[in-house]
Amino acid sequence: MATVYDVPGDLLVERVAQRLKEIPEIKPPEWAPFVKTGRHKERLPEQEDWWYYRVASILRRVYLDGPVGIERLRTYYGGRKNRGHAPERFYKAGGSIIRKALQQLEAAGFVEKVPGKGRVITPKGRSFLDKIATELKKELEEIIPELKKY
């Protein structure tokens, strides 16, 4: 059985985002169409369903790095801000988006909070991601036969 480590992250996040749309606990808040994802961004996300992609990416990040807190995720999703003539500077991403996404993942049972440490993935969340990774790896093996070695 393949794990998250065995497949490309971008393809996995895309597939997980499609599956998360079917889960009733995970839905974008009413303010989601109007917000930037951080201070460093100039514009809103272009995709209509960007919320599901961010939640899928956070779920993958908790799987890989857990236990992980909101501040570490803010740093991961942050970036450099263009300040005109002034030198660029790193700014963290917005915390509300990450906080609400983690709360929705907790409600769905994919993530749980460990006091003093942060969020970790639950067995249900690990199984959810590993099943999708296994399906994705089988599809990739048909396209790229060299992947059967792994």
From Swiss-Prot:
Species annotation: Pyrococcus abyssi (strain GE5 / Orsay)
Gene: rps19e
Xref: SMART domains: Ribosomal_S19e
Subunit description: Part of the 30S ribosomal subunit.
Family assignment from sequence similarity: Belongs to the eukaryotic ribosomal protein eS19 family.
GO molecular function, one term: structural constituent of ribosome
GO biological process, one term: translation
Domain of life per record: Archaea
Cross-referenced NCBIfam families: PRK09333.1
InterPro entries xrefs: Ribosomal_eS19, Ribosomal_eS19_archaeal, Ribosomal_eS19_CS, WH-like_DNA-bd_sf, WH_DNA-bd_sf
GO cellular component, one term: cytosolic small ribosomal subunit
Gene3D superfamilies to which the protein is assigned, alphabetical: Winged helix-like DNA-binding domain superfamily/Winged helix DNA-binding domain
SUPFAM superfamilies: Winged helix' DNA-binding domain
Job of this protein: May be involved in maturation of the 30S ribosomal subunit.
Pfam (any one): Ribosomal_S19e
Protein's name according to its UniProt entry: Small ribosomal subunit protein eS19
Keywords noted in UniProt: Ribonucleoprotein, Ribosomal protein
Origin organism lineage: Archaea, Methanobacteriati, Methanobacteriota, Thermococci, Thermococcales
